[in-house]
Amino acid sequence: MNLDQFNPGQDEKPLDHLVPGGGMSCILRTIGCVGDSLASGEFESLDENEKKGYHDYFEYSWGQFMAREIGSKVYNFSRGGMTAREYCESFADSMDFWNLDKRCQAYILALGVNDISRALNPEDSMELGELTDVDVKDYHNNKPTFIGYYAQIIQRYQEIQPKAKFFLMTIPRAYDCDETKNALQDRHAQLLYGLADLLEHCYVMDFRKYSPIHDEQFRKTFFLGGHLNAAGYLLSARMITSYLDYIIRHNMDDFKQIGFVGTPYHNAAEPW
């Protein structure tokens, strides 16, 4: 048997290829997906009077496509329109998402699109913020900015599952994005990289750098109005599991004890 397939290639980049069956992502047996409409399988409808509707179909979410592909339990901690602020201030509590019974070995955070829309709204006080807005010792002291709330989500899940792994998703590039929004999305990515350095067990999934650009052909094939279609959510799931596989293979020591996360056991001879 040739084990080279599991070894990181010298020039390998994330998403160089899609991994059949999810690859090493299968070792993550419980996963929480924290996000907005694109984490919720949201479809956009349009009636004969040009009235739009937005409908979350979680069975079509990339999280549930992942669950079916890799055989893991995947939670949708998400809803269309979600922001980091709303998640912390009301949504997670109202949905009982901090419940110990819903603890996961891994969390994928896909928030920022709606937060940036709020930052662009002159009537909204939301700012993306700075890494200094994060108190790594006490999230109660985090400032009320996007990155302050985003970090709080991680910190609160770390309270209930201290050794969980966190995967932070950047925003893919779109061909029709204006300069101002592009700059904020770039800043969003920079903040996530900085946060991954500040907090333990965090990894960036840089879809902004490595995923296909959402150009006209991509939108024609994988979008339904302003949101993904069913095939688009399936493609997203395949890209996410392949990216997880890449991260795990490039950080094998970090995942040696993933099977003990959420249990009272560990192996003192190995790193977490």
Features from the language model and the residues they span:
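Catalytic His-Asp segment of secreted/periplasmic serine-dependent ester chemistry enzymes
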Residues: 171-272
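Generic structural signal for well-ordered alpha-helices
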Residues: 150-155, 189
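Structural recognition of the beta-strand scaffold that forms the well-ordered cores
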Residues: 32-34, 74-78, 105-110, 165-170, ...
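Solvent-exposed loop/turn segments at secondary-structure junctions
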Residues: 37-40, 79-85, 113-118, 172-176, ...
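Serine-esterase "nucleophile elbow" of acetyl-processing enzymes
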Residues: 2-78, 95-99, 249, 253
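Proline-centered flexible-loop/turn and helix-kink motifs
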Residues: 162-163, 200
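Conserved SGNH/GDSL esterase-like catalytic core that processes O-acyl groups on lipids
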Residues: 44-131, 135-144, 148, 265
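N-terminal cationic-hydrophobic initiation segments that often serve targeting/anchoring roles
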Residues: 67, 99, 154-159, 196-197
